[in-house]
Amino acid sequence: MSFTPANRAYPYTRLRRNRRDDFSRRLVRENVLTVDDLILPVFVLDGVNQRESIPSMPGVERLSIDQLLIEAEEWVALGIPALALFPVTPVEKKSLDAAEAYNPEGIAQRATRALRERFPELGIITDVALDPFTTHGQDGILDDDGYVLNDVSIDVLVRQALSHAEAGAQVVAPSDMMDGRIGAIREALESAGHTNVRIMAYSAKYASAYYGPFRDAVGSASNLGKGNKATYQMDPANSDEALHEVAADLAEGADMVMVKPGMPYLDIVRRVKDEFRAPTFVYQVSGEYAMHMGAIQNGWLAESVILESLTAFKRAGADGILTYFAKQAAEQLRRGR
């Protein structure tokens, strides 16, 4: 007879036995979070000696490149394996055609070069998207009716990804959700000799209300206004569609896939991992961070909620986590908490 949980009966089975001591709890732990699972997203400013707090993201700052290099010393010492860069584009450099996105002297490109030179062992992941660079805050080029044009936008995204690879980024991460952009970027990278540049595809990126603080951070909230991204980001009600998106991106040459946001979409993380067994990442987005940090600062939740929330992503099947809590999590893990 096969053994199933239904065959286990009290008192011979006491599930609390293995919870009795710390050593046995550690021995039977099914999922373990380590610093190797963490990616820290950072917001990069133009200028020198610049630091700006983000009111909707307590504890997170926008940093100029010189300040970013100073902070990165500590992040590297903590063992954080990679940073995800998000540039804050000056208003005067935004345009309808998002040309600043592929400027070789743009903020992301300069930050990538500086970080690679100072910390050659540190992974640099760059955001491939147009919303920080457009005057309207959308992730692509618009037609006369305000609709985001898919194929025209891809042409700009390809130029942006190539500029990041040429600056030294080891991973480019298209977050735009245009159809076919992964294949176009992969083909361009191969043709340009960037065969080892990885693509982390934002494959299942939902049209979520949890992105608000991020848009404040990169300065696109005012540009987007009351607009939305429902014509290209996924409907939060859909689950099967996420599998189609992931399948398409893997077929087009993605090396890693992502689910975004994280906590409200743990079911999607599990489905993606079970279906494809591909490297699967999840983004604990700005709204999730703001909720947790607000509760921590007000004494409503203990700081231990940070590691608990990140462990939930591991339990759901994630191989890595983009989180603004990466530094705090690394410190807590080092202390054994």
Swiss-Prot record:
Keywords: Heme biosynthesis, Lyase, Magnesium, Metal-binding, Porphyrin biosynthesis. One of its GO terms (cellular component) is cytosol. Mg(2+) binds at E245. It catalyses: 2 5-aminolevulinate = porphobilinogen + 2 H2O + H(+). Its cofactor is Mg(2+). SMART domains: ALAD (SM01004). Stimulated by magnesium ions. 5-aminolevulinate 2 binds at S286, Y324. GO terms for molecular function: porphobilinogen synthase activity; zinc ion binding. This is Delta-aminolevulinic acid dehydratase. The gene is hemB.
